[in-house]
Every structure is written in C-alpha cells, then in structure tokens.
Amino acid sequence: ITDNNQIQLGIRDKNIEYAVSETGDVIAFVQQGELWCFDRVNNKIVQVFSFLGAEGINARDNWDQHDIKIARVDEAGSIDFVVYGYMNRGDHEGEVGTAVYHYDGLVHTIEEEIFIPSDVSYEILKAQMGQLMYVNEKGTFYLIMDQKLYSIDTDKRTPEVLVKDLKESCYKVSESNQYFAWVDSDKEYKSDVIHLMNLKNASVYDIKAKKGAYILPLGFIDEDFIYGAAKKDKVMVAAAGNTVFPMKNLTIMDTSENSHSILKTYEPSRGSIGFISVEDYTITVSYTHLTLPTIR
C-alpha cells in the first residue's frame, strides 16, 4: 500500500529484504514470500514474483519453504533476484534449489536465467544465502551456495564453480559484495597466500605472506581489505581441538581501482592478536585476555 509516496507493510519483523536503485527512485522489496517493485516518481507498485495463485488459498501455493534475495535494481525497475528453497510451482515444482531471475521493468516480463538444484534443506540454503550475491555490468552473476562460489553467465545460462569446499573461516566478503577474499580450504590457518577477487571484472590478486608467516582474511571496512599474519611456528592446535592463530600484525589494504596499496599496518608492542571485530569504520583488536585500543 502506498500512502504519501510511502510503503506501509503492516505488522511484520524489521528485517526487510530490499534494494534501491542508484537514485533512490525505484525500490524492490520482499513481503510474505513475494517480490514487489515500487516506483516512487510515478507512485506505482508492481508485483514482480509470487508463487500464489489468484485466490491465494491453495495449500501448495502457501507452502512457505522458500525465500527471495534481491541482487540489483535499476532506474527502469529491472531487477536481478534469486528465489531459493522449495519451488511451489513452475518448471521446477517440487524441487529444492536456487533459481536466478531477471525482471524487465520496461516490458514487465520475467525470465529464469538458471536453476541450480540442491540436496540440502531450505533452512540450510537460507543460512547460506546472502553470504555473497553480486551482478557485474557484463551480466555475470556470482553467489555462494552449498559451500561453493558460483559464476553464472546469464547469456549462456551456464554455472561455473570458481571455488569449492568453502569454510566460513576461510573467506570474507566486502559490504558491496564486489570483493571476495579467500584461502584454500585445505590450507585453513596455514596458508601463505590470500586470493582477492574483484567480481566487477573477475580479476584475482594474490597477497603473499612474508617468509615464515601464514596469513588469514579477517574482513573489510567498506572495500578496504583487512588480513592478519601469524608466525608459522606459533600456529598450533589446542587441546580442545581448535586452532590457535596468534597474529603478530594486521594489514589494511586499499582495493579501489585494483591499487592494492597498504593503507595501514598495526603491530602490537607486546603479545599477539587473538581476534578482531569490525563495526562501521572501527576495528576492535583483542588479545586473548586483554582488549586493546580501537583502530580508526
């Protein structure tokens, strides 16, 4: 419902899946398993995708084991989005998987670009979805599903697995989803190379550790990449089975325009860094038993 150029969604949780065009004139949002597009300039709202029939009372239609993630919306109201989980109807009715769609806002048509079946439940897909989803200007669609990074050529409608066996501790994604940093899963906590991919142009830059050190991706501040280094002889498996990775320093790298210049290096005067947390533009660096001053 639109009222005074606003959308009233009624009583629902605060976590709304939505995306806004560059100028802010077009808003795509998900409401009760349906995708909608709102044109603020013309005060018009369009239903883009729904499994519901005209009556909306069919048990098959109302089976809510699916969800929608929006990748991109433009000024014409065209939307790239993903439907994942149990497919209530259509060509893949009864299957579980991920479908990539493109909605053309000018002619109001929707086209399935690819469907990737999955043997995991909707709940597992939901936990994985949203870790990375990006569409570049060439129309290449990237997403993480089933512990794999997929590259999907939407013209050829073919998926390619770029990285497999992903572990959450082995990769990080920038806020815009444009940059993806990872170490090979078989070298978790013992890698001397971090791969940094710019999904805008599919270029990969390898960050190499100094002699005698392992490196690990830690996160991003906007598009600036943060990674830590630990001495090889200090990395060990504790009695509880967890790996101790005591970092001797942190590095913040500029990724803009593929410059890869070092913006800042932080090395504590004593001891080692146990872990970090990133919030807004602040990195909180912590020892195992002692919190250090924040880096801004």
Task: Locate each region found by the language model.
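Beta-propeller fold detector
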Residues: V46-L52, I110-I116, V161-K164, Y205-A209, ...
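Beta-propeller blade signature
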Residues: E95-L106, H195-L199, F245-S256
